[in-house]
Amino acid sequence: MNAEYNKKLVEDMYVALNTKDLDAHDLYWHKDMIWHGPPGFGNIHGLENFKEQVMKPFYAAFPDYYVKNDIVVADEKWVSATGYLTGTHSANYLDIEPTGKAIKMQFSDFWL
């Protein structure tokens, strides 16, 4: 794979994630993936666990979730992206009652 292919793959993945379709993850993640999450999550092993433990609750809590990349850089073996997630906190998430307020979180992701 070349850098441009890898960069486009990640950009396409974020477009798919904005659909909030859990099955869209299947196109971009290996079934035996490991997601290294922040405190509160730790490491999640396996695509199905990732979808059920991370993305499904997130999509439910932030039904208008949207992710936008600001910068995507790539090489032949890696990709890194940074940008923002936005949404409205509409349901319980990580034992935090919904606030009805908009959120904006900066992210930085790295893939090998």
What are these regions (language model features)?
Residues 11, 18, 68, 75, ...:
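Activation on folded, globular domain regions of eukaryotic proteins
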Residues 10-11, 35, 58, 79, ...:
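Short, structured motif recognition centered on aromatic/hydrophobic residues
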Residues 5, 63, 77, 103-105:
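Residue-level preference for beta-strand/loop junctions
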Residues 26-76, 84, 88:
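A solvent-exposed, acidic/Ser-Thr-rich amphipathic alpha-helical stretch
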Residues 8, 14, 21-22, 44-45, ...:
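Low-complexity, intrinsically disordered short segments enriched for Gly/Pro and polybasic residues
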Residues 84-112:
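Exposed beta-sheet edge and beta->alpha loop/turn motif
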Residues 1-31:
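Short, low-complexity N-terminal intrinsically disordered segments enriched in polar/charged residues
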Residues 2, 6, 46-47, 100:
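Residue-level preference for long, well-ordered alpha-helices that form the structural scaffold
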